[in-house]
Amino acid sequence: MKPRFPQNVYFLARYSYLRRFQHSQRRTFSSFLNNIRSNYSGARASPLGGSSGAGAGAGGGGTGDSKGNAFLVPGATMATILMLGALHARRLYEDKKIEEKREKGIELEFHPDIKASFLGVLPLRSISRAWGSFMSLEIPVWMRPYAYKAWARAFHSNLEEAALPLEEYTSLQDFFVRSLKEGCRPIDPDPCCLVSPVDGTVLRFGELKGNRGMIEQVKGHSYSVPALLGNNSLLPMEPEGKNESKEEAVGDKSDKSWLRVSLASPKLRENVSASPMKGLYYCVIYLKPGDYHRIHSPADWNATVRRHFAGRLFPVNERATRTIRNLYVENERVVLEGIWKEGFMALAAVGATNIGSIELFIEPELRTNKPKKKLFPTEPPEERVYDPEGLGLRLEKGKEVAVFNMGSTVVLIFQAPTANTPEGSSSSSDYRFCVKQGDRVRVGQALGRWKEE
């Protein structure tokens, strides 16, 4: 009769054998790694093949571990480079697909994703302030031409237009907000045209209709103009209906919206009420990091009100416009409102990540992207009325008004002549845009024209 062993004894013996085998394998593998590390450390200590470094590395365990840590650094660096390269390749691939869709006439639609939600929890305002501090650091004189030329190659900037030699820009911040040589941006002299206030790409343009005044951010999503300019905006929106009801509604709207400013500027209300009915138009222009960053006046006009909205600082690139709702309404911005010879005009300078600082030349004391005292502030936008005794501040066509610390977006909203003609007919006095979506424009270039009747 064969002896029988208990089942648990068999499994215990099997488990003990596996443990001894695994321990032996780990010890062999550890010895192999230690040899590699010691050889690598010896090669670094003695490039010509000295044996002392290798012998020391193969010695005590503590010394081997301390020198072995250096072996992990190149691997981590290489992994980081590969990861960044993969992300960049993916971005280039997606951009290429977007360009192919545009060439085929396919318009991109709004599509929110999880990345946009993740951006909402990041401290983008603090990051932008830290970035601004870094960009303000002084660069050694000998290094400045190399740094600025590298930036120009990366973002396609024209250094020949810079007003000063590259050595005179003490920091990247000074270089970004540089002025241009005289005559680099000729201003269209036609009195019946509105010129571009910035260098950039035309994203959207058109006529505002209805009482809500919606601007299409991207196909499938729009944002409200009153939300962009503020609830106290002087915007003369017209409700849909017959011409007579339109005139009455506009009169009521003007009485309410202009009441606050008219108390301080009686001449302002007289000019607005005396001006004829006009169409309301908009134009959205995006500035890339390599573009000229100063904002100029699009026409001769009087700025009467300035509002500063301390909002978020989401990025405003093409990907962000397709994934973040109400992007321009959510972001920090400075709005200038006033009148010109054709009626209402507003210029909204919208900030973005690392571009929270917007400076006004007409109000140097204004500071944007300041630390918030509350986590979720509910206070209204900061507002200032210019020149309460008169018609506001006079801004001449083509003159510098403000500056972005990098690139961002400008939204221009204005009234222009519209002929009161039956539907389906045209008139030479109508305002017409002379740019197309996606066009590159420069300061002083005409955005649209009309003819005097």
Swiss-Prot record:
It catalyses: a 1,2-diacyl-sn-glycero-3-phospho-L-serine + H(+) = a 1,2-diacyl-sn-glycero-3-phosphoethanolamine + CO2. Residues 30-74 are mitochondrial matrix. Keywords: Decarboxylase, Lipid biosynthesis, Lipid metabolism, Lyase, Membrane, Mitochondrion, Mitochondrion inner membrane, Phospholipid biosynthesis, Phospholipid metabolism, Pyruvate, Transit peptide, Transmembrane, Transmembrane helix, Zymogen. One of its GO terms (molecular function) is phosphatidylserine decarboxylase activity. It comes from Arabidopsis thaliana. Expressed in roots, leaves, stems and flowers. InterPro entries: PS_Dcarbxylase, PSD-B, PSD_type1_euk. Its EC number is 4.1.1.65. This is Phosphatidylserine decarboxylase proenzyme 1, mitochondrial. GO terms for biological process: phosphatidylethanolamine biosynthetic process; protein autoprocessing. Belongs to the phosphatidylserine decarboxylase family. PSD-B subfamily. Eukaryotic type I sub-subfamily. Heterodimer of a large membrane-associated beta subunit and a small pyruvoyl-containing alpha subunit. Binds 1 pyruvoyl group covalently per subunit. GO terms for cellular component: mitochondrial inner membrane; mitochondrion. It is an enzyme of class 4 (lyase). The chain crosses the membrane at residues 75-93. Its cofactor is pyruvate. Residues 94-453 are mitochondrial intermembrane. Disruption phenotype: No visible phenotype under normal growth conditions. The modification Pyruvic acid (Ser) is found at S408. Pathway: Phospholipid metabolism; phosphatidylethanolamine biosynthesis; phosphatidylethanolamine from CDP-diacylglycerol: step 2/2.
